[in-house]
């Protein structure tokens, strides 16, 4: 049996690896496995021609997972595959080690790893951290849940003549489910709020996967976490080699906040690191993201100048409280990435009043949308709901706000526009997944921009 705690002793030429899932991460893991000389077998539930084309000449099966998967020494599981599928259970019964693509790729790099997880804000934070590393002269490889699959970056690293490389990873709870020896030098946890409860039994099960990162840090590394998050503050308060960031207190923080100004050292230091008002990001949740990235970068040894310059020059990531434009003094913001309650609350809190809020899509699992009410009061003038979750949202919020139901996403935005007046803000922050009408949140956000463009042109 393969000893996953002694990777260096494995003879890869004699090792059979089954890869479950032929999406981006699965194909990348297969390419990396082929490079190291392992025997690769890919099993994919779909049988689409595109999937088959991506697999290429490797040994594979499509249209379901047969017992051929069990003819393996290691199973690499793609993150989108739930743990309760029968073939996973059978692998467990036969004691076949199951690892994530993240765990697998980590075996083949000696470069430092900066890894971040959390419920909301991950992509903005890791992109900013990535820019800080580049600004400091590092070869930064952005991957995981954003950018390239980790395996693809590791393979490129192995086959290219690059120096001073660092892996910056965004990690979802799914990607953390089967880690073993994965040990980043710097690990960050932004926040934990209810999400993916269609996959996890409850918030505790979901939080456990996120918190797993805190126990997988290199012995010389650091854990960076948000002291304002109640789950993190309680769970990680006794963690050694940890540094916190906070909007509410400066104790134990390297970067300290005074109003919108951030200092390294004491708050009366005249040489501030940056003023949040000088950045291109909106909303105090983004100030939190900046503090997280800056703290991780500082812990890694990135220069103060590189941190400052990256913050000031950073451009917001699409679909994350993205200002799309203005029509007749009505602003349009695309926050399609806000697929849960906490993300929507953070977006709504970024505005003072006159909000027309678009909610809806596919509910992730018995969501209590009334949690939005305290934040929406005095800010939201009306709500437009759409999609599979639209009627349930209407049932929960109808007594509190003027509310209109639209079955279709485009109708929802057109209705919001028709109901708007000069000085209003139309905010798409749906608090739901996109899978009822779109392939992903990016497609939904792009549709928002497309409709806005038509409205702007008067079409």
Go through the PLM ranges and name each one.
Residues 34-35, 67-70, 79-227, 231-241, ...:
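Phosphate-binding loop of NTP-binding sites
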Residues 52, 59, 370-424, 459:
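C-terminal helical cap/extension that packs against the catalytic core
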Residues 1-100, 104, 282:
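N-terminal leader/targeting and accessory segments in enzymes
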Residues 39-45, 224-227, 358-360, 379-388:
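Short internal beta-strands
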Residues 2-17, 27-36, 139, 274-380:
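Nucleotide phosphate-binding/pyrophosphate-handling subdomain across enzymes
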Residues 44, 61-63, 99-103, 240-257, ...:
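Beta-strand->loop->alpha-helix junctions that form or flank phosphate-binding loops
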Residues 33, 75, 116, 145, ...:
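Residue-level signal for inorganic ion chemistry
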Residues 24, 82, 120-124, 287, ...:
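Residue-level detector of alpha-helix initiation sites
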């Amino acid at each position: 049996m393969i000893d996953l705690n002694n990777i260096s002793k494995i003879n890869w030429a004699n090792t059979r690896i089954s890869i479950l899932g032929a999406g981006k991460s699965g194909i990348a893991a297969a390419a990396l496995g082929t490079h190291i000389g392992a025997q690769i077998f890919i099993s994919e539930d779909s049988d689409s021609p595109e999937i088959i084309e991506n697999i290429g000449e490797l040994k594979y099966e499509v249209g379901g997972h047969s017992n051929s998967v069990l003819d393996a020494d290691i199973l690499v599981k793609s993150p989108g595959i739930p743990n309760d599928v029968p073939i996973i259970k059978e692998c467990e019964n036969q004691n076949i080690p199951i690892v994530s693509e993240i765990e697998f790729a980590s075996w083949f790099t000696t470069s430092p790893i900066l890894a971040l997880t959390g419920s909301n804000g991950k992509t903005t934070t890791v992109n900013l951290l990535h820019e800080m590393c580049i600004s400091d002269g590092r070869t930064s490889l952005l991957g995981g849940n954003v950018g390239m699959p980790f395996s693809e970056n590791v393979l490129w690293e192995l086959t290219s003549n690059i120096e001073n490389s660092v892996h910056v990873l965004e990690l979802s709870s799914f990607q953390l489910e089967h880690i073993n020896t994965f040990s980043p030098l710097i690990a960050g946890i932004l926040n934990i709020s209810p999400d993916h409860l269609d996959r996890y039994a409850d918030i505790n099960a979901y939080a456990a996967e996120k918190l797993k990162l805190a126990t997988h840090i290199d012995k010389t590394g650091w854990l960076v976490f948000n002291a304002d998050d109640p789950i993190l503050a309680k769970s990680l308060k006794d963690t050694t080699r940890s540094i916190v960031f906070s909007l509410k207190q400066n104790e134990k923080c390297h970067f300290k906040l005074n109003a919108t100004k951030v200092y390294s050292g004491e708050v009366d230091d005249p040489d501030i690191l940056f003023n949040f008002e000088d950045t291109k990001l909106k909303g105090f949740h983004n100030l939190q993201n900046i503090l997280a990235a800056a703290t991780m970068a500082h812990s890694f040894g990135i220069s103060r100048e590189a941190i400052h310059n990256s913050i000031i020059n950073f451009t917001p990531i699409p679909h994350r409280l993205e200002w799309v434009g203005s029509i007749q003094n009505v602003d349009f913001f695309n926050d399609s990435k806000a697929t849960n309650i906490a993300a929507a609350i953070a977006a709504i809190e970024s505005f003072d009043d006159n909000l027309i809020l678009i909610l809806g899509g596919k509910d992730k699992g018995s969501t209590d949308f009334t949690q939005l009410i305290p934040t929406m009061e005095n800010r939201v003038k009306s709500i437009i709901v759409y999609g599979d979750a639209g009627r349930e949202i209407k049932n929960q919020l109808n007594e509190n706000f003027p509310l209109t139901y639209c079955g279709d996403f485009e109708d929802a935005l057109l209705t919001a526009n028709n109901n708007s007046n000069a000085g209003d803000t139309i905010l798409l922050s749906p608090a739901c997944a996109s899978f009822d009408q779109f392939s992903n949140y990016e497609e939904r956000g792009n549709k928002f921009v497309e409709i806005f463009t038509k409205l702007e042109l008067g079409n």
